């Protein structure tokens, strides 16, 4: 399974693919062909769900 990185943003937290990186200033994920994903906290791990 692919792993995702969590990007913190002002309104929401999104996830990026492992290869992709987050913008430092805007703290947003790079453009993806698929829909954007957001991070959800579950116990001690972060998981991504389709937004």
From Swiss-Prot:
Tissues/organs with expression = Testis.
Q: Which UniProt keywords apply?
A: Chromosome, Developmental protein, Differentiation, Disulfide bond, DNA condensation, DNA-binding, Nucleosome core, Nucleus, Spermatogenesis
Metal-binding recorded as keyword? no
For this chain, one GO molecular function annotation is: DNA binding
- Protein's UniProt keywords contain Nucleus: yes
Question: InterPro entries per the record?
Answer: Protamine_P1 (IPR000221)
BP-aspect Gene Ontology terms? chromosome condensation; sperm DNA condensation
Per the record, its GO cellular-component terms are: nucleosome; nucleus
Q: Where in the cell is it found?
A: Nucleus; Chromosome
> What protein family does this chain belong to?
Belongs to the protamine P1 family.
- How does this polypeptide assemble, per the annotation? Cross-linked by interchain disulfide bonds around the DNA-helix.
Q: What does this protein do?
A: Protamines substitute for histones in the chromatin of sperm during the haploid phase of spermatogenesis. They compact sperm DNA into a highly condensed, stable and inactive complex.
Q: What is this protein called?
A: Sperm protamine P1
**What gene does this protein come from?**
PRM1
């Amino acid at each position: 399974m692919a792993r995702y990185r969590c990007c913190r943003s002002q309104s929401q937290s999104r996830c990026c693919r492992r290869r992709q990186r987050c913008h430092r200033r805007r703290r947003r994920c790079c453009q993806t062909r698929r829909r954007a994903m957001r991070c959800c906290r579950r116990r001690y791990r972060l998981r991504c769900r389709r937004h």
